[in-house]
Swiss-Prot record:
Compartment(s) of residence: Cell inner membrane
Complex formation: Homotetramer.
Pathway: Purine metabolism; GMP biosynthesis via salvage pathway; GMP from guanine: step 1/1; Purine metabolism; XMP biosynthesis via salvage pathway; XMP from xanthine: step 1/1
Main subcellular localisation: membrane
Lyase listed as a keyword: no
EC number per UniProt: 2.4.2.-, 2.4.2.22
Residues engaged in binding Mg(2+): 89
Annotated function: Purine salvage pathway enzyme that catalyzes the transfer of the ribosyl-5-phosphate group from 5-phospho-alpha-D-ribose 1-diphosphate (PRPP) to the N9 position of the 6-oxopurines guanine and xanthine to form the corresponding ribonucleotides GMP (guanosine 5'-monophosphate) and XMP (xanthosine 5'-monophosphate), with the release of PPi. To a lesser extent, also acts on hypoxanthine.
Stated name of the protein: Xanthine-guanine phosphoribosyltransferase
Record SUPFAM superfamilies: PRTase-like (SSF53271)
Lineage: Bacteria, Pseudomonadati, Pseudomonadota, Gammaproteobacteria, Vibrionales
Membrane topology qualifier: Peripheral membrane protein
Length: 152
């Protein structure tokens, strides 16, 4: 993927707060299931904004930085998802989302970002991303010095 969409820490918080507004009233939720690792930061923000204390994880390995590979469930939360929000950072081709949907059919499944190929697996999201665009998450980046374009 040659196109990149960079999400800063500030943007991640802003986008996830927008998602939290869509999940009101908060008292309808028993808890949050974060899809590890991409859903961990959004889950923490949702937990704060919706005052939810019960946070669990489902751990699925499907990426090596920017290359998708075979999915493997490493850990899962109990139940069918009833009364729970399942959160991930994004839905891309829908492979992980399809598995999550099968595991937690009664959950409200949301992501911060969504690409066209996977949108139909989730219930809500905030940011539309083109299918050919790689998303750079803030936890995958560091601030570093860059030389000026023109040195005098």
């Amino acid at each position: 993927m040659s196109n990149k969409f960079v999400i800063t820490w500030d943007n991640m918080q802003m986008y996830t707060r927008q998602l939290a507004e869509k999940l009101l009233p908060a008292d309808q939720w028993k808890g949050i299931i974060a899809v590890s690792r991409g859903g961990l930061v959004p889950a923490a923000i949702l937990a704060r904004e919706l005052n939810i204390r019960h946070v669990d994880t489902v751990c699925i390995s499907s990426y090596d930085h920017d290359h998708q590979r075979e999915m493997k469930v490493l850990k899962q939360a109990d139940g069918d998802g009833e009364g729970f929000i399942v959160i991930d950072d994004l839905v891309d081709t829908g492979g992980t989302a399809e598995l999550i949907r099968a595991m937690y059919p009664k959950a409200k499944f949301v992501t911060v970002c969504a690409k066209p190929a996977g949108k139909h697996f989730i219930d809500d999201y905030v940011v539309d991303i083109a299918q050919d665009t790689w998303i750079e998450q803030p936890w995958d980046m560091a601030v570093t010095f860059v030389d000026p374009i023109s040195k005098k």
